[in-house]
C-alpha cells in the first residue's frame, strides 16, 4: 500500500510507477511481445489486425474531437451555431468512417451491427428508457 504522497512525492511516484509496470501486460511493455500478439491474432482469426488497429485508434481520437466541441459549447462559451454544428457533422463523419473500418476489420455487416444494437436496447428498455434499466442490467446484458 502506498504511503501519503505528501511525505515524499518522488518516492510515491516511483512506487506507483513500479506498481503500474507490474500490472501491465507484456504486449503493452515490449515491442516483441506486441508483435507476437498481433501476429497471433492475424494468423488465427478472421480479424484484419491493421484495419482494426486503425479503427480503434481513430474512433477514440475522433470521438474525443467531437467531445471537445461539446465541452467547449457547454462549459466554455463556444457558440452553438451553424459553424460548430457543421464542425461536429464533419467529426461525426470521421467517426462513421472509422466505425465502418472496424466493421470491415471484423467482417461484420454494418446493417447487422445496427440491428443487433437495436435488439439489445429493445431487450434492455422495452418501449422506453428508464434509469433503473440503464443501471441494473440483466445477466448477459453487455
Which residues make up each language-model segment?
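Flexible "arm" and connector segments at domain edges
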Residues: 1-92, 96-142
Amino acid at each position: 500500500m502506498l504511503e501519503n504522497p505528501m511525505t515524499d512525492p518522488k518516492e510515491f511516484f516511483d512506487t506507483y510507477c513500479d506498481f503500474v509496470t507490474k500490472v501491465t501486460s507484456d504486449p503493452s511493455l515490449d515491442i516483441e511481445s506486441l508483435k507476437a500478439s498481433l501476429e497471433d491474432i492475424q494468423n488465427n482469426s478472421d480479424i484484419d489486425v491493421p484495419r482494426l488497429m486503425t479503427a480503434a485508434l481513430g474512433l477514440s481520437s475522433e470521438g474525443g474531437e467531437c467531445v471537445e466541441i461539446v465541452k467547449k459549447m457547454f462549459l466554455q462559451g463556444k457558440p452553438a451555431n451553424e459553424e460548430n454544428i457543421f464542425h461536429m457533422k464533419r467529426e461525426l463523419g470521421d467517426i462513421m468512417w472509422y466505425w465502418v473500418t472496424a466493421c470491415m476489420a471484423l467482417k461484420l455487416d454494418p446493417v447487422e451491427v445496427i440491428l443487433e444494437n437495436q435488439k439489445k436496447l429493445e431487450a434492455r428498455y422495452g418501449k422506453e428508457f428508464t434509469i433503473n434499466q440503464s443501471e441494473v442490467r440483466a445477466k448477459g446484458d453487455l
